[in-house]
């Protein structure tokens, strides 16, 4: 049935030249208010039709309702065509400007039968109470549009009408949901509301049917040709997919799942008996992923928050005092987003940055009953989920924007591409499954959810993808540097990709190191959860198991990276070091380089009189390994000739702190023993104080028990916290991340210190410019308590202390 205007009216309906066609009705509100429209003539500017054609009974522009259209564009009243729905009293609710086409001096066109006198007054539906109105604003009704296929337009509209009427009946509230003073006479107005909504939907549907019919006629030839060539019309297929995804009629909406006006996906609807778990994870849309920030930004914000926590301790005792976390939670004002790190994030941040910001949590009243420790425990769990979403966001950018770049793929060879990106897609898939399980756990019980068992369950999968990726880090770095130097197209293509707002102008290297950063951060997040669990509880046991599994994974990753670097370094040195005497087997899996460098050997001149000491200086090069020391002289072409070597047990070092008479510089004495006697004795001079202390510390290493005493028993021992990341340049240095806390062991006057990291017990040298002193005694004591808390929990499982 042709419902459109005659062909002669098409130029008039198209509007003046140069103007775009606009839809008949547009609404962007969450809730609509439909008002009865007074009778009037059709706007002659919009419909230039002869008056006799409007009065003709059979004309398509007659004001009377055509019989074929009754019940199609709007349902027929049960009492016949003249039956009207009674309206309630009340003033007119102003509509939105531009909702209907209008012209000066004319009312909106009449779309229904001739009006009776009772419709002359403005009418509206009755108002609901605040709760019902808020609930109805969160519900949206969609109409099933299936305008493709071989069905006739009439059949399609009848099918859509039946499906929509069923959905509307299911969504219509019962009388018990309305307030008592508005129950009487509200059944008909509510039916009136949905009739108006149904009217607008079907008007849009009829317009789309006309356009889709014309489109099918115009594109039938080209579409058939594309199919014969084995190609699908991409534009039409995407349009069909969009309609199929956005127009399907939803079932009854559970208002308990609505957060902030958005309907959240339910996990139970994703579980089907014949559904593959991986496909369910891919089809399920994360509630945090779409609006999450990049992981690089999250790391900066989280580090700044931890630094502010230490600064608050500097200003005065806070919640770190003993027993402070057992009291009631902070006041409501302190739980607002403005006092959290969400105020520091960008506008593209995640929907809820804090667990306490979730509407279900705020509305439950549980915040008033939880202690400060319990609040921090839930926030630590929630941060693990939101940070994982941020991590996947960055991985998606790395895989989609960089790895998926056609231009970059054409520039790189297959082997270079494999070495540069390694197993990054597999890491992303594993993290997506992990986030899927975490969100299911959160949605199951948002008030008392747990995550450590989920972490423990995924640790084997983490090991399968993280260990190969981190092990490949050395090849990855070398491949990146080689491509910059040898591939002329690579720097330009990479620069264009890095300038894109998709990656927020961050370099590719910041994305490639994310897996190693994440596995370390994941251990830290689980450690924060463990610190706040009740001692002896089941939660503590599960958190300890998850922490131990992640700690073991991090240790394996570090050992794998160090093993490759150490082996390559030994192979490189074996080609340069030559022994004058017997052959020394340098390459060994149990050996690694600790420190190397050149010092000045001082020796008295034989002809010098004893009263006037004169010293000769000679350069000597030291290669210190974990089990032996090699002393050599430099030769041509960068080679070394070893003249003496000794085991670590045969070394004795002494710091000559007081300057010897006539011997300037930073001097220390090195003895190579043979039994109880000194086989060789060398007076060595370093260039700086820190160089001398670093050599003394390396030649006389402390035992693990001594390092443990520094971290556990030294309540008055100084502590520092990293404020700037530092990458170790020498084997005896320590790589630092922001917020790392060190117990200071040795300081030098030229700006270096040796410390032991509380988190893992690693020891090394770092520049003082990258750390700040923790002067607050309460903050230092709290750091030691947290360290002992984790160590005691780990010892219950038989693991070595963290």
Curated annotation (Swiss-Prot):
Listed CDD domains? PH_ephexin, RhoGEF
Gene Ontology terms for molecular function: GTPase activator activity; guanyl-nucleotide exchange factor activity
**Start-end of Basic and acidic residues biased regions:** 228-244, 265-274
Cite the SUPFAM superfamilies for this sequence.
DBL homology domain (DH-domain) (SSF48065), PH domain-like (SSF50729), SH3-domain (SSF50044)
What InterPro entries is this protein classified in? Answer: DBL_dom_sf, DH_dom, Ephexin-like, PH-like_dom_sf, PH_domain, PH_ephexin, SH3-like_dom_sf, SH3_domain
- Where does the DH domain start and stop, copy by copy? 376-560
The record's annotation in PROSITE patterns points to: DH_2 (PS50010), PH_DOMAIN (PS50003), SH3 (PS50002)
Record protein name field: Rho guanine nucleotide exchange factor 19
Q: Which organism is it from?
A: Mus musculus
């Amino acid at each position: 049935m042709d419902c459109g205007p005659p062909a002669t009216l098409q130029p008039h309906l198209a509007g003046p030249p140069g103007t775009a066609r606009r839809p008949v009705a547009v609404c962007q509100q969450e809730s609509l208010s439909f008002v009865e429209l007074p009778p009037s003539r059709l706007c002659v500017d919009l419909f230039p039709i002869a008056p006799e054609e409007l009065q003709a009974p059979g004309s398509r522009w007659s004001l009377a309702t055509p019989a074929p259209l009754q019940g199609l564009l709007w349902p027929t009243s049960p009492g016949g065509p003249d039956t009207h729905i009674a309206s309630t009293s009340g003033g007119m609710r102003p509509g939105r400007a531009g909702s209907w086409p209008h012209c000066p001096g004319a009312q909106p066109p009449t779309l229904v039968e001739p009006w009776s006198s009772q419709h002359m007054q403005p009418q509206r539906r009755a108002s609901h109470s605040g709760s019902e109105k808020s609930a109805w604003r969160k519900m949206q009704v969609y109409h099933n549009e299936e305008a493709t296929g071989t069905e006739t337009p009439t059949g399609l509209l009848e099918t859509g009408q039946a499906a929509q009427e069923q959905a509307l009946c299911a969504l219509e509230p019962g009388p018990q949901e309305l307030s008592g003073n508005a129950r009487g006479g509200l059944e008909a107005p509510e039916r009136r509301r949905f009739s108006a909504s149904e009217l607008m939907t079907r008007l849009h549907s009829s317009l789309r049917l006309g356009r889709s019919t014309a489109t099918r006629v115009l594109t039938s030839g080209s579409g058939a040709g594309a199919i014969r060539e084995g190609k699908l019309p991409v534009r039409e297929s995407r349009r069909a997919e969009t309609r199929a995804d956005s127009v399907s009629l939803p079932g009854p909406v559970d208002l308990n799942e609505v957060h902030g006006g958005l309907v959240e996906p339910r996990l139970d609807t994703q579980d089907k008996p014949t559904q593959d778990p991986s496909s369910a994870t891919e089809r399920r849309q994360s509630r945090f992923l779409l609006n999450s920030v990049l992981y690089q930004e999250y790391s900066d914000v989280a580090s700044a928050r931890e630094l502010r926590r230490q600064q608050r301790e500097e200003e005065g005792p806070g919640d770190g005092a003993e027993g402070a976390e057992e009291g009631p939670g902070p006041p409501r004002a302190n739980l607002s987003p403005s006092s959290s790190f969400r105020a520091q994030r960008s506008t593209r941040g995640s929907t809820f940055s804090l667990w306490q910001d979730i509407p279900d949590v705020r509305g439950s009243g549980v915040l008033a009953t939880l202690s400060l420790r319990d609040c921090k425990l839930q926030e630590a769990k929630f941060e693990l989920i939101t940070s994982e979403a941020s991590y996947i966001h960055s991985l998606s950018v790395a895989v989609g924007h960089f790895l998926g770049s056609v231009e970059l793929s054409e520039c790189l060879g297959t082997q270079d591409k494999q070495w540069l990106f390694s197993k990054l897609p597999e890491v992303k898939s594993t993290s997506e499954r992990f986030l899927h399980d975490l969100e299911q756990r959160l949605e199951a019980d948002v008030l008392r959810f747990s995550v450590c068992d989920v972490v423990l369950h995924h640790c084997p999968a983490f090991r399968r993808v993280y260990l190969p990726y981190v092990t490949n880090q050395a090849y990855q770095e070398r491949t990146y540097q080689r491509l910059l130097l040898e591939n002329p197209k690579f720097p330009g293509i990479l620069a264009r990709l890095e300038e894109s707002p998709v990656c927020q102008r961050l370099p590719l290297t910041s994305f490639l190191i994310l897996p190693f950063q994440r596995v370390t951060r994941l251990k830290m997040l689980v450690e924060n959860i463990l610190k706040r669990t009740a001692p002896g509880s089941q939660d503590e046991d599960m958190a300890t198991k998850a922490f131990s599994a992640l700690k073991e994974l991090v240790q394996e990753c570090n050992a794998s990276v160090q093993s490759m670097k150490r082996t390559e370094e030994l192979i490189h040195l074996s080609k340069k070091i030559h022994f004058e005497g017997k052959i020394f087997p340098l390459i060994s899996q149990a050996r690694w380089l600790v420190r190397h460098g050149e010092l000045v050997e001082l020796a008295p001149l034989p002809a010098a009189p004893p009263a006037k000491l004169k010293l000769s200086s000679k350069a000597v090069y030291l290669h210190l390994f974990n089990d032996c020391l090699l002393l050599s002289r430099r030769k041509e072409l960068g080679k070394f000739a070893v003249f003496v070597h000794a085991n670590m047990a045969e070394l004795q070092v002494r710091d000559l702190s007081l300057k010897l008479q006539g011997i300037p510089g930073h001097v220390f004495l090195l003895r190579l023993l043979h039994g109880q006697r000194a086989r060789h004795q060398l007076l060595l001079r370093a260039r700086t104080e820190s160089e001398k202390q670093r050599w003394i510390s390396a030649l006389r290493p402390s035992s693990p028990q001594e390092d443990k005493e520094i971290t556990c028993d030294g309540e008055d021992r100084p502590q520092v916290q990293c404020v700037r990341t530092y990458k170790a340049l020498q084997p005896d240095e320590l790589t630092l991340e922001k917020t790392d806390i060190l117990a200071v062991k040795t300081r030098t006057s030229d700006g270096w210190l040796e410390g032991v990291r509380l988190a893992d017990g690693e020891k090394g040298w770092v520049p003082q410019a990258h750390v700040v002193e923790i002067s607050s005694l309460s903050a230092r004591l709290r750091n030691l308590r947290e360290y002992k808390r984790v160590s005691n929990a780990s010892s219950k499982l038989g693991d070595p202390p963290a």
